[in-house]
């Protein structure tokens, strides 16, 4: 018994999830158990055995798990040697991810393709034809299939070249059952590759045919991020358990249809979706095709069913008021639902109001609507009470708008220039240790209570002294000089004998 376990892990391994512990047993029963440490994900357990009876039992257990366990994503591919081909699709309904297992080594080949109708991401889906196989062809023995990727060595993969103008199958049609014919749904650069071991129990050509026929149409990369687990079952006890994990937000969501990198609002597990995401087992031998409706939406609207942004919370339906048989009656007041919806300006430079503020103004305006209805029914608009109510509502709305303007308008540029900038004070005395005569410019404080020296214009002084006006308007130095000069003048005036013959008072003061 050969157990071929392939684990493709993108980027880092030092993360929170210990995933994909593949136990390789030496028994004849091939059980590839994926022990996932995720609490919510016990996914993709592939029980492959040689007995047809065990496969039938596993299928019954899988149906019970898919129907009863809404919190577990159980997609078990259990068809190895049966004549019935069960295609278990792990449907990621948020990203339209289809995991389809093709067991073509049985008598009946049933290939099921689950498409998304007219989705813009699937406009480039192409059909890849089956590889030509020959028993003597050495290339085909090493031929491996891969989804289109740029990070894969060319020595392991040989991807067929196909033209974009190749004819596509219709979205709802089942492709012809000719071995490994599948559609390339890979739109991203995530890699899914398969590596082959030589089987000692089957010939080289038979192994190649079975490997190519059992290729899983593995839509790992239908949308922006896919974490899909794909099972590739090969006959004669060859179990290819491919565990693919995409690196999402520094953690591995392995064996998990759990989308963290999608642009949608819902993180959906297979059986845990609010959008009716079902794990469908497709039995093609019974001609029962269960189409999952969540993967057949035109624009993937199932991911936006819970979007509250599409609701017009403050929209008012149209109001039609019957007209009275009067000589003059105004036309009925109609309010369109879209006219009262607060619109956010698209210009980046325009001030954007918060939803709370815009809704408050909208409520103030909408309160006027019933009053306008009553006024339209009145004769001649002579009801003063209704007019007063309207005036009050308008005043409240205007008051609120003015408050918003005060907060939204830019502040006025403050003028820091003062009148005292233009004032100059001429020195009445030469300053100490200063031999030049320069006009001293000093700033006068805007505070009228602050004292300024009237002679030199200083504001700081240890003591304020009396000036010519009789008040303490001079600083300490100017006050002392003024007092000394005045005292000397008084002494000379009181004693005329001390005055020289050719000396006058003004000459003394100037000296």
Curated annotation (Swiss-Prot):
MF (Gene Ontology): sequence-specific DNA binding; zinc ion binding
Pfam families referenced in this protein's UniProt entry, alphabetically: GATA
Alphabetical UniProt keywords: Metal-binding, Zinc, Zinc-finger
Alphabetical list of SUPFAM superfamilies matching this protein: Glucocorticoid receptor-like (DNA-binding domain) (SSF57716)
Example GO biological process: regulation of DNA-templated transcription
Top-level taxon of the source organism: Eukaryota
UniProt key word Lipid biosynthesis: no
InterPro entries recorded: GATA_ZnFinger_Domain, Znf_GATA, Znf_NHR/GATA
Region named Disordered: 1-194, 214-313, 325-355
Zinc finger boundaries on the chain: GATA-type: 453-478
CDD domains, alphabetized: ZnF_GATA (cd00202)
Signal peptide residues on this chain, from the entry's feature table: none
Biased composition (Low complexity): 1-111, 136-166, 214-309, 337-351
Compositionally biased tracts (Polar residues): 124-135, 167-185
Keyword Metal-binding attributed: yes
PANTHER family: GATA TRANSCRIPTION FACTOR 22-RELATED, GATA ZINC FINGER DOMAIN-CONTAINING PROTEIN 12
Protein name: GATA zinc finger domain-containing protein 15
Protein source organism: Dictyostelium discoideum (Social amoeba)
Gene that encodes it: gtaO
């Amino acid at each position: 018994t050969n157990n071929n376990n392939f684990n493709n892990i993108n980027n880092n391994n030092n993360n929170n999830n210990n995933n994909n512990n593949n136990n390789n047993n030496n028994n004849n029963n091939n059980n590839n158990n994926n022990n996932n440490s995720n609490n919510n994900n016990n996914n993709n357990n592939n029980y492959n055995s040689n007995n047809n009876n065990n496969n039938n039992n596993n299928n019954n257990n899988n149906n019970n798990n898919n129907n009863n366990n809404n919190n577990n994503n159980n997609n078990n591919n259990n068809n190895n040697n049966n004549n019935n081909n069960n295609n278990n699709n792990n449907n990621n309904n948020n990203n339209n991810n289809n995991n389809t297992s093709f067991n073509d080594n049985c008598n009946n080949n049933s290939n099921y393709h689950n498409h998304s109708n007219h989705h813009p991401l699937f406009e480039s889906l192409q059909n890849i034809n089956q590889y030509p196989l020959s028993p003597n062809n050495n290339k085909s023995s090493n031929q491996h299939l891969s989804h289109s990727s740029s990070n894969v060595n060319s020595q392991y993969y040989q991807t067929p070249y196909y033209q974009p103008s190749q004819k596509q199958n219709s979205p709802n049609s089942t492709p012809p059952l000719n071995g490994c014919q599948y559609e390339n749904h890979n739109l991203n650069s995530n890699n899914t590759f398969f590596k082959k071991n030589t089987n000692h129990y089957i010939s080289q050509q038979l192994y190649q045919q079975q490997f190519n026929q059992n290729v899983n149409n593995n839509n790992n990369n239908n949308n922006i991020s896919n974490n899909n687990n794909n099972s590739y079952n090969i006959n004669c006890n060859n179990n290819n358990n491919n565990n693919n994990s995409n690196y999402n937000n520094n953690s591995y969501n392995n064996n998990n249809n759990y989308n963290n990198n999608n642009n949608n609002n819902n993180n959906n597990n297979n059986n845990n979706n609010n959008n009716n995401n079902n794990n469908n087992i497709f039995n093609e031998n019974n001609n029962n095709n269960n189409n999952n409706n969540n993967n057949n939406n035109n624009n993937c609207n199932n991911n936006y069913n819970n979007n509250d942004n599409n609701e017009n919370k403050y929209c008012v339906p149209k109001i039609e008021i019957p007209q009275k048989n009067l000589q003059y009656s105004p036309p009925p007041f109609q309010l369109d639902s879209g006219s009262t919806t607060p619109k956010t300006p698209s210009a980046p430079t325009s001030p954007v109001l918060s939803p709370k503020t815009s809704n408050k103004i909208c409520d103030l305006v909408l309160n006027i609507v019933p009053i306008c209805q009553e006024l339209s029914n009145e004769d001649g608009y002579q009801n003063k009470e209704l007019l007063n109510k309207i005036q009050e509502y308008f005043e409240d709305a205007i008051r609120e708008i003015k408050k918003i303007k005060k907060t939204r308008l830019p502040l006025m540029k403050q003028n820091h220039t003062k009148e005292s900038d233009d004032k100059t004070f001429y020195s009445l005395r030469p300053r100490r240790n200063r031999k030049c005569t320069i006009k001293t410019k000093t700033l006068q404080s805007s505070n009228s209570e602050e004292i300024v020296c009237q002679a030199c214009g200083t504001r700081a002084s240890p003591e304020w002294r009396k000036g010519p006006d009789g008040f303490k308007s001079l600083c300490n130095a100017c006050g002392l000089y003024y007092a000394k000069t005045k005292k000397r003048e008084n002494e000379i005036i009181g004693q005329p004998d001390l005055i020289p013959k050719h000396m006058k008072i003004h000459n003394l003061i100037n000296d």
